[in-house]
Regions:
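Small-residue-biased structural context
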Residues: 1-166
Length: 166
């Protein structure tokens, strides 16, 4: 699979995670006919674990952003997770599912990004901008507090210390 710019959401961390999932799908493709089932199993396991952590990150982001379809989006993730878990169980049972899994993942990921993930982008970007603004405001507040504290300490010094600090 090759990443295409139209899949970019414009949210750096999400795009980085999506690209990493594509890397896992490509590793799966490379190993699909390998006699090394252990290596194939490792890639499948790592890909599933990473994808689940991505889902948690993404779901938390869109819930915090107040995205109105966060619930249905999470359901789509749950259905996908169930399908992949079933395939992983079949693999663990000795069945050769690499080509089937690769095909399903390839189709699902790109369709999901285009049709589902792009829906939350505006809400998530607005939320992230506000969060960054709040962080900046908090830094400014803390800075002002610190300066005020330093001023108060300076005023509390005795007349001799104030005289010598001039």
């Amino acid at each position: 699979l090759a990443w295409v710019p139209e899949l970019d959401t414009g949210i750096d961390e999400i795009d980085r995670q999506h690209r990493r999932i594509v890397d896992y799908i490509n590793k799966l493709y490379e190993l699909r006919e390998s006699p090394d089932r252990e290596a194939l199993g490792d890639v499948i396991g790592e890909m599933v674990d990473y994808t689940l952590s991505h889902f948690v990150f993404e779901e938390t982001l869109i819930e915090n952003a107040g995205y109105m379809f966060a619930g249905p989006h999470k359901k789509v993730h749950e259905l996908f997770t169930r399908r992949v878990s079933e395939m992983q169980s079949r693999f663990d049972g000795g069945e050769d599912v690499a080509a089937e899994l690769h095909g399903m993942l390839s189709r699902w990921l790109f369709n999901h990004i285009r049709n589902e993930d792009h829906g939350y982008v505006d809400a998530a970007k607005t939320y992230l901008r506000m969060a960054r603004g709040n962080e900046q405001a908090e830094r400014e507040r803390l800075k002002a507090e610190l300066l005020q504290e330093l001023e108060q300490r300076q005023q509390k010094k005795g007349w001799l210390a104030r005289l010598l600090s001039r």
